[in-house]
Amino acid sequence: MMKPSNISISAVKLPQDLDDFKMLVQEYLQEFGMDLTFQNVDDELANPMRKYGPPHGIMLVARDEHGTALGCVAVHPFGGPGCCEMKRLYVRPESRGLKLGVLLVKEIIQYSEKLGYSSMVLDTLDTLLPAVRLYKSFGFKTTEPYYHNPIPNVVYMRLEMSK
C-alpha cells in the first residue's frame, strides 16, 4: 500500500494535468451515475478552466510517485464576496483508504484561504457517509440549500474558514 509521503497534490497547470482532471471527473460521474446536466457538467468538462481556473478558482490533482492521477478536487467563487464552492472531490476506488480525501480537502481549504475566501460551501449526498464524515471532520456544518439541486437526499454544508 502506498504511503501519503509518496503522494503529491498540485494545481492543474499543464495540459496533461487538465486532461487528468477531466478524466477523473468523468470517472466520478460514471461511478455515481448521477445526471448533473442541471449543473452544465458538459460545459464544465469542455473547459474546466472557465469555472475553476485562476485567478479565483483552482483544480488540484493527487498523483502517486509514478505520476498516475489518483484523485481531484476543485473550488470556484460562489454566492457572493468571500465565498467559494468545493466541487468534484473524487478519489479512484483503488486509491481509497489512503486518506487521499483528507489530503485533498486540507489542500483545497488552504488554497481557498490563500485566494482570499472566508467561507466554503459544498453539497453531497447523505448516502455518501464517508464524505459527510470527512467534511464534518474539517468543521463543515449542515446548512440551508444554497441552490436548487433536483437530486434527492442532498446535504448542503458550509465551512467558516479562518481569516
Swiss-Prot record:
Predominant subcellular localization, coarse grouping: cytoplasm
Enzyme Commission number(s) from the entry: 2.3.1.-
PROSITE patterns in alphabetical order: GNAT
Domain N-acetyltransferase: 7-162
Subcellular localization(s) per the UniProt record: Cytoplasm; Nucleus
Keyword Cytoplasm in record: yes
GO cellular component, one term: nucleus
InterPro entries linked: Acetyltransferase_Enz, Acyl_CoA_acyltransferase, GNAT_dom
UniProt keyword terms in alphabetical order: Acyltransferase, Cytoplasm, Nucleus, Transferase
Any one GO MF annotation of this record: N-acetyltransferase activity
Family: Belongs to the acetyltransferase family.
Record PANTHER family: FAMILY N-ACETYLTRANSFERASE, PUTATIVE (AFU_ORTHOLOGUE AFUA_2G01380)-RELATED (PTHR43305:SF1)
Name of this chain's protein: Uncharacterized N-acetyltransferase C1271.07c
